[in-house]
A protein has these predicted regions:
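C-terminal cap of metal-dependent C-N hydrolases
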Residues: 95-143
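Catalytic beta/alpha-barrel core
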Residues: 4-8, 34
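His/Asp/Glu-enriched, well-ordered alpha-helical/loop segment
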Residues: 14-107
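Context-gated lysine
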Residues: 6, 20, 27, 54, ...
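Helical hairpin unit composed of two closely spaced alpha helices linked by a short loop
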Residues: 10-12
Length: 143
């Protein structure tokens, strides 16, 4: 299944128990539904899914821990890619789909780990930070 958290929140259909789906071993991808949302940004979908899962945890089921950014990133990449074949991961035999992002303008007073840099990027992302894109191993033009 594909979860579109912003759309679900905007049209008030509820908050999916994403953690439960993952724990059951279901294939779960993350999407951005422009019909019910306001952006196609997968980074926004990542942060919205984390926020939604925290709300579900706090208001509905405190036994079901909220998603982490790493969980949501998995759903946005490997989870969603699992529906389309060998995409969504940097592994041998998989198609190379990637973006190169420059986060140097996101100031921080201390050195951050790669995990912390990525989490910060998810919450502060704009398209202007993409410096290169690759689809199926080929560099493509940036819009």
């Amino acid at each position: 299944m594909i979860l579109c958290p912003q759309s679900n929140m905007n049209v008030a259909t509820g908050i999916a128990p994403a953690r439960k789906y993952l724990e059951r071993g279901l294939k779960v991808g993350l999407g951005s539904d422009l019909a019910g949302g306001s952006t196609l940004s997968i980074f926004r979908a990542i942060t919205d899914s984390v926020v939604a899962s925290k709300l579900r945890w706090r208001l509905v089921d405190q036994n079901l821990k909220p998603l982490s950014v790493a969980d949501a990133f998995y759903m946005a990449t490997r989870g969603g890619g699992s529906f389309f074949g060998k995409v969504g991961a940097f592994e041998e035999g998989f198609e190379m789909d990637a973006v190169v992002i420059d986060d140097s303008a996101l100031y921080t007073p201390k050195k951050l780990s790669m995990h912390d840099r990525f989490e910060r990027l998810c919450y502060l992302y704009t398209d202007s930070k993409i410096v290169a894109k690759c689809v199926a191993g080929k560099k493509i033009e940036i819009d």
